[in-house]
Design a protein with these regions (language model features):
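Transmembrane helical elements of multi-pass membrane transporters/channels
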Residues: 9-25, 131, 206-210, 214, ...
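Helix-terminus/linker motif at the lipid-water interface of multi-pass membrane proteins
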Residues: 23-41, 110-119, 175-179, 184-194, ...
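Short runs within selected transmembrane alpha-helices of multi-pass transporters and secretion channels
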Residues: 61, 131-150, 158-166, 199-214, ...
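Small-residue-rich hydrophobic transmembrane alpha-helices
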Residues: 40-100, 139-158, 276-342, 373-396
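Short alpha-helical transmembrane segments in multi-pass integral membrane proteins
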Residues: 1-14, 68-135, 184-248, 304-369, ...
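Transmembrane alpha-helix boundary and packing residues in multipass membrane permease domains
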Residues: 14, 18, 29-30, 66, ...
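N-terminal transmembrane alpha-helices
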Residues: 2-30, 34-35, 51-63, 92-99, ...
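Residue-level hotspots within pore-lining transmembrane alpha-helices
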Residues: 16, 20, 24, 53, ...
Length: 452
């Protein structure tokens, strides 16, 4: 009962937070879908690029989460506060550097990866990336702050901030994408419609506001956090080493993983605009299906890290096993619900019949594959919480670059199964990685990493 209560107390706020994180992307994709398949294709293409860099920031967040969680387990609050400062400054420097480089090479990047796309799709993609890349520093800062708070067990603040961000994004998104023409009390209210530019503007503003709020919450502190001033800042080599010992392998894993996804996206671009749009819609709906799984994966990182920090090896392993089994049951149920409603939910994104038909195939295949998702992602998150990031990095690289890309290319391009073939390659990757993580869990090497 202790494990169950402990998990539920942490997982429910994270699940609510992840629901709203998911909705942030879903609403943007949905609203872009009603502009046209060119717009939703552009959003999906740019998100594939953005996710490469966002994954780097997420890796820093994982490093901060694990180090803070283990320091909390040791009741070393002084080191917790130093870790927060070091992680935030590193994140800001890294994200500003990436932003500048991406601004310089933005057009070349679009042409390099998506040169075969239709001109209207590419022009929309260039507009969308110009706005979203400027939010990288805000995304990095918010992700690190969220990770730190989760490492402390404070999961409610990220939840509330993400909820508010969604309200801002949906409200501004509707106004900026479609424009309004109202006449309340005889007062004429009109705003122009900005189309895909409006979609980019709304999500950018929401991210900036969310970053400001979460940083303010972090500085207010809690029972573990009492930061004081960041500046004058001095690099603490030992703390940075602890963060990057976790963050670098996690970052390389996510960088190579998302680079692989970008290559897969290039395969899909050659299949035409309908295929690109279907893939974007399918991924958006898959993010809805995965909310519970993502929440339990994030919980695994924090809980395993805290148990390891306390020296409770048995508790770490039993909690990770419980989370994996619980996620499997939950995702099986969610998948069973989404199989019959796939046509209805696809039609919420677009009225294009061919796009809807392909999206239905993708959603239903994803629902069937959900039972193997937890062993690939929840186990991986728990291993990272223990500091076993080098193993998860190598496993993810093997799964992506040998199995997902190769299988996806053969099935999707060579054998002409289309986007569905690409997705079957993704499920093969999940199964291979999950099998390797299960083998790792049976041993004890993953429990022997000293992080904090």
């Amino acid at each position: 009962m202790f494990i169950r209560k402990n998990v539920i107390k942490l997982a429910i706020p994270i699940m609510i937070e992840q629901t709203f994180v998911m909705l942030l992307g879903v609403f943007n994709t949905m609203m872009a879908g009603h502009i046209g398949e060119e717009a939703v294709s552009a959003v999906g293409m740019v998100d594939s690029i953005n996710n490469i860099f966002i994954s780097v920031f997420a890796a820093l967040s994982v490093g901060a989460t694990v180090v803070v969680a283990q320091q909390i387990g040791k009741k070393d609050n002084e080191k917790v506060n130093e870790t927060i400062k070091q992680a935030l400054v590193s994140g800001v420097i890294l994200s500003f550097t990436i932003t500048i480089l991406m601004w310089v090479f933005r057009t070349g990047v679009i042409n390099l990866f998506y040169g075969s796309a239709e001109e209207l799709v590419k022009s929309n993609a260039k507009l969308y990336i110009e706005f979203t890349l400027f939010t990288y520093p805000f995304i990095a800062t918010q992700q690190i702050a969220n990770g730190i708070l989760r490492g402390c067990g404070d999961v409610k603040k990220p939840m509330y901030v993400t909820m508010f961000m969604n309200i801002v994004n949906v409200t501004l998104g509707y106004i900026l994408i479609y424009g309004i023409d109202l006449n309340p009390l005889g007062i004429n209210l009109q705003t122009p419609s900005y189309g895909i530019t409006g979609a980019a503007m709304s999500i950018a503003i929401a991210r900036i506001i969310g970053c400001i709020i979460i940083i303010r919450a972090l500085f207010k502190g809690n029972e573990f956090i009492s930061m004081g001033k960041i500046f004058p800042f001095k690099i603490d080599v030992e703390t940075q080493k602890s963060i990057f010992n976790i963050g670098i392998p996690a970052g390389v894993e996510q960088l190579l993983f998302n680079a692989g996804k970008l290559i897969v996206q290039v395969f899909i671009v050659t299949m035409g605009t309908s295929a690109i749009a279907s893939n974007a819609i399918g991924m958006s709906i898959a993010s809805i299906i995965n909310v519970i799984g993502n929440a339990l994966a994030l919980s695994a990182t924090t809980l395993v890290g805290q148990y390891i920090g306390r020296g409770d090896i048995k508790g770490a392993k039993s909690t990770l096993l419980y989370l994996t089994k619980f996620a499997t049951i939950c995702l099986f149920v969610v998948g069973a619900i989404f199989i019959p409603i796939a046509p209805w939910i696809s039609s919420m994104y677009t009225q294009n019949a061919s796009v809807i038909d392909i999206s239905i195939q993708l959603i239903r295949s994803d629902c069937l594959a959900m039972v193997i998702w937890p062993i690939s992602f929840v186990l991986s998150a728990g291993l990272k919480g223990a500091g076993d990031t080098r193993y998860t990095m190598m496993t993810a690289v093997i799964g992506m670059w040998i199995f997902r890309i190769f299988t996806g290319y053969v099935l999707g391009v060579v054998l002409e199964f289309g986007v569905l073939g690409i997705w079957i390659g993704m499920y093969t990757d999940w199964l291979v990685r999950g099998t390797l993580y299960c083998l790792r869990l049976r041993g004890t090497k993953w429990l022997k990493h000293k992080v904090a």
